[in-house]
């Protein structure tokens, strides 16, 4: 198994309601596949998990400006919050 990678989840934009009141610029650092500390929206994490999994094991997104990130992950509750997941190492 690969060493867990340091990654960052960031809110890129919010265009509507959000129960957790996330706003653009909010950031959480995670290591490997651990959930962010302090609680995190389960629906949003469920959507982010495949991206975090892929990044943790070395995936690259060649169609992104930064190949070590994906910034098109949207909240499944209406799509009002868009997240970016980035491998930091």
Task: Describe every region a protein language model picked out.
Residues 12-16:
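Short alpha-helix capping/helix-loop boundary micro-motifs
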Residues 5, 60-89:
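Short, compact, well-ordered microdomains
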Residues 35-45:
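Short, Lys/Arg- and Gly-enriched loop/turn segments at beta-strand edges
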Residues 1-9:
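Short, basic/aromatic beta-hairpin or loop at an interaction surface
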